[in-house]
């Protein structure tokens, strides 16, 4: 099986098992012998609790092997799926990855691709471009060159625990943040750069699900998952955030959620995201940086999300429904006889936002633990993560939850 190389090594000091298909040797075609080598890597990873990195560059399978080839693919899929949630799995696609091989690669926790790589389940090779895979949310990181793609895989490994029994990795040196102080109205990326250690945010799926920003960052040296929800959260963004939170939960990585969103665009996907947050037992700290109304608050920040700590900026707005609808529902009679109904309506909405929808009101009712100023966000989040680092939760015995998929 010279068309594939397997072994182990250290990535930034972290042990890992690896396999790499060689597209220049028989096209890297999958065979029974190659499958046995790869399956052995997965079995060793399971025994030792070590991450697996697979480098894909193969034209497909050896058709001459017929049923043996099908069985070989099936064994790899089964072993890989059984390893899911036990050790991190990263696929690095540098060349063709077509048909069943694509199923194996896409089943990893994260998929990193170079610009010229191909990834599709269609054996004809159609719709296989890296850009298409990124647009569909299958590719998490797309880089121009093979070298850049491999470097991103290295950064991912450094951000992740070795297995599901280890805690979140922490840097030897405490990180610092030199970003400008936060101010009201800051966008998601500005908030993230202001709470994360300098140059540590590694974004995933940037061009999929535009109303959710996800990725890993260091906060005072501790690795954590970051989710920033904004605007109206569409279906792709719900799926993107849900899968990311599920990964963090599987490996006990703390999740910091930043919320500035008005609502959901898809009930089905909103249910998926809500179930994910509610079920996750990892450390969860939420900061409402802007708007958080009704279902969004309940699903991502409130008791329904099972958040450990929920904080809000003093300028934030928390309400069962949008302030515009709530103000008219409660105070519409105050517009009777108004000579300027449009202007007076705006005043009523603003009054509702600064009174009943204010975070101080939510804190008084026990729905928020702390009201903070923007420039306190990094320090407050880090302190909460530190205090919650010993969190332990017991769950009911069951095979798994039946969430919307």
Give the ranges of each region predicted by the language model.
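Ligand-binding clefts of soluble mixed alpha/beta catalytic domains
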Residues: 1-405
């Amino acid at each position: 099986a010279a068309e594939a190389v397997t072994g182990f090594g250290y990535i930034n000091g972290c042990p890992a098992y690896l396999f790499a298909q060689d597209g220049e040797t028989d096209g890297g075609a999958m065979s029974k012998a190659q499958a046995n080598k790869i399956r052995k890597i997965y079995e060793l990873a399971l025994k030792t609790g070590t991450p697996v990195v697979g480098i894909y560059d193969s034209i497909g399978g050896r058709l001459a092997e017929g049923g043996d080839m099908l069985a070989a693919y099936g064994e790899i899929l089964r072993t890989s799926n059984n390893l899911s949630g036990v050790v991190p799995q990263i696929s690095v696609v540098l060349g063709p990855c077509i048909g069943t091989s694509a199923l194996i690669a896409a089943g990893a926790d994260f998929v990193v691709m170079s610009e010229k790589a191909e990834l599709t389940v269609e054996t004809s090779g159609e719709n296989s471009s890296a850009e298409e895979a990124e647009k569909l949310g299958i590719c998490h990181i797309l880089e121009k060159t093979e070298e850049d793609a491999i470097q991103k895989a290295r950064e991912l490994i450094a951000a992740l625990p070795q297995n599901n029994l280890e805690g979140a990795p922490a840097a030897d040196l405490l990180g610092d943040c030199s970003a400008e102080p936060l101010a009201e109205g800051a966008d998601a990326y500005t908030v993230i750069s202001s709470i994360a250690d300098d140059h540590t945010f590694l974004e995933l799926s940037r061009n999929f699900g535009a109303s959710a920003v996800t990725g890993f960052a260091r906060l005072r040296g501790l690795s954590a998952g970051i989710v920033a929800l904004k605007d109206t959260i569409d279906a792709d963004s719900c799926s993107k955030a849900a899968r990311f939170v599920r990964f963090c939960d599987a490996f006990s990585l703390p999740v910091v959620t930043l919320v500035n969103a008005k609502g959901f665009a898809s009930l089905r996907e909103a249910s998926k995201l809500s179930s994910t947050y509610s079920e996750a037992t990892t450390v969860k700290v939420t900061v409402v940086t802007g708007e958080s109304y009704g279902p969004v608050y309940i699903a991502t920040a409130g008791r329904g999300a099972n958040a450990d700590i929920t904080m809000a900026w003093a300028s934030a707005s928390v309400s069962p429904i949008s302030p515009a609808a709530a103000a008219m529902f409660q105070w519409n009679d105050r517009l009777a006889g108004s000579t300027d109904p449009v202007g007076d309506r705006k005043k009523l909405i603003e009054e509702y936002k600064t009174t009943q929808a204010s975070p101080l009101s939510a804190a008084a009712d026990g729905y928020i633990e702390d009201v903070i100023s923007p420039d306190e966000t990094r320090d407050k989040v880090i302190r909460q993560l530190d205090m919650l680092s010993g969190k332990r939760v017991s769950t009911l015995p069951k095979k798994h939850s039946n969430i919307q998929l």
